[in-house]
Swiss-Prot record:
This is UPF0235 protein Spro_4033. The lineage of its organism: Bacteria, Pseudomonadati, Pseudomonadota, Gammaproteobacteria, Enterobacterales. Pfam families: DUF167. It comes from the Bacteria. Belongs to the UPF0235 family. NCBIfam families: DUF167 family protein (TIGR00251), PRK05090.1 (NF003466). SMART domains: DUF167.
Length: 96
Protein backbone atom coordinates (compact mmCIF):
# COMPACT_ATOMS: atom_id res chain seq x y z
CA UNK A 1 0.00 0.00 0.00
CA UNK A 2 1.35 3.43 -0.89
CA UNK A 3 1.35 6.49 1.36
CA UNK A 4 -1.80 7.95 -0.27
CA UNK A 5 -4.62 5.78 -1.62
CA UNK A 6 -7.89 7.00 -3.11
CA UNK A 7 -10.91 5.33 -1.48
CA UNK A 8 -14.63 5.55 -2.22
CA UNK A 9 -15.34 8.67 -0.16
CA UNK A 10 -11.93 10.39 -0.12
CA UNK A 11 -8.33 9.48 0.70
CA UNK A 12 -6.61 6.99 2.99
CA UNK A 13 -3.21 8.32 4.08
CA UNK A 14 -0.41 6.56 5.95
CA UNK A 15 1.58 9.05 8.00
CA UNK A 16 4.79 9.29 9.99
CA UNK A 17 4.44 12.12 12.51
CA UNK A 18 7.25 14.32 13.85
CA UNK A 19 5.91 16.11 16.95
CA UNK A 20 7.52 19.21 18.53
CA UNK A 21 8.80 20.44 15.16
CA UNK A 22 9.65 24.09 14.52
CA UNK A 23 6.67 24.48 12.15
CA UNK A 24 3.69 22.60 10.76
CA UNK A 25 4.35 21.15 7.32
CA UNK A 26 3.87 18.17 5.06
CA UNK A 27 7.50 17.14 4.56
CA UNK A 28 7.26 14.41 1.92
CA UNK A 29 7.86 10.68 1.74
CA UNK A 30 9.44 8.83 4.67
CA UNK A 31 9.81 5.22 3.54
CA UNK A 32 6.32 4.21 2.41
CA UNK A 33 4.58 6.86 4.54
CA UNK A 34 3.96 10.58 4.23
CA UNK A 35 5.95 12.54 6.84
CA UNK A 36 4.15 15.39 8.58
CA UNK A 37 5.89 17.69 11.06
CA UNK A 38 3.71 19.40 13.69
CA UNK A 39 4.55 21.82 16.49
CA UNK A 40 2.40 20.21 19.20
CA UNK A 41 4.01 17.90 21.79
CA UNK A 42 2.89 14.25 22.01
CA UNK A 43 1.17 14.76 25.37
CA UNK A 44 -2.47 14.01 26.27
CA UNK A 45 -3.56 13.78 22.63
CA UNK A 46 -2.39 17.32 21.80
CA UNK A 47 -0.41 16.12 18.78
CA UNK A 48 -3.39 14.18 17.38
CA UNK A 49 -5.74 17.14 17.81
CA UNK A 50 -3.21 19.48 16.23
CA UNK A 51 -2.59 17.03 13.36
CA UNK A 52 -6.32 16.79 12.59
CA UNK A 53 -6.67 20.59 12.68
CA UNK A 54 -3.61 21.06 10.41
CA UNK A 55 -4.71 18.44 7.85
CA UNK A 56 -8.29 19.74 7.83
CA UNK A 57 -6.93 23.16 6.91
CA UNK A 58 -4.60 21.72 4.22
CA UNK A 59 -7.39 19.68 2.57
CA UNK A 60 -10.09 22.35 3.21
CA UNK A 61 -12.47 20.02 5.06
CA UNK A 62 -14.15 20.11 8.46
CA UNK A 63 -12.16 18.59 11.33
CA UNK A 64 -14.86 15.91 11.58
CA UNK A 65 -13.94 14.70 8.08
CA UNK A 66 -10.40 13.78 9.21
CA UNK A 67 -10.32 10.58 11.27
CA UNK A 68 -7.45 8.56 12.70
CA UNK A 69 -8.14 4.93 11.81
CA UNK A 70 -4.93 3.41 13.23
CA UNK A 71 -2.04 4.61 15.36
CA UNK A 72 -3.73 6.83 17.93
CA UNK A 73 -0.79 6.44 20.33
CA UNK A 74 2.18 6.16 17.95
CA UNK A 75 4.08 8.09 15.30
CA UNK A 76 2.84 5.80 12.52
CA UNK A 77 -0.79 6.59 11.73
CA UNK A 78 -3.42 5.82 9.13
CA UNK A 79 -5.98 8.55 8.48
CA UNK A 80 -9.03 8.93 6.30
CA UNK A 81 -9.96 12.28 4.80
CA UNK A 82 -13.54 12.41 3.53
CA UNK A 83 -14.34 14.50 0.44
CA UNK A 84 -11.20 16.69 0.34
CA UNK A 85 -11.92 20.04 -1.34
CA UNK A 86 -8.24 20.66 -2.09
CA UNK A 87 -5.26 18.32 -2.30
CA UNK A 88 -1.80 19.75 -1.47
CA UNK A 89 0.78 19.33 -4.28
CA UNK A 90 3.00 17.02 -2.18
CA UNK A 91 0.05 14.67 -1.63
CA UNK A 92 -1.31 14.91 -5.20
CA UNK A 93 2.05 13.68 -6.53
CA UNK A 94 1.74 10.51 -4.41
CA UNK A 95 -1.78 9.43 -5.37
CA UNK A 96 -1.62 6.11 -7.21
Amino acid sequence: MSAVTPVLDGLAIRLYIQPKASRDQIVGLHGDELKVAITAPPVDGQANAHLIKFLAKQFKVAKGNVTIEKGELGRHKQLRIVNPQQIPDVVAALIE
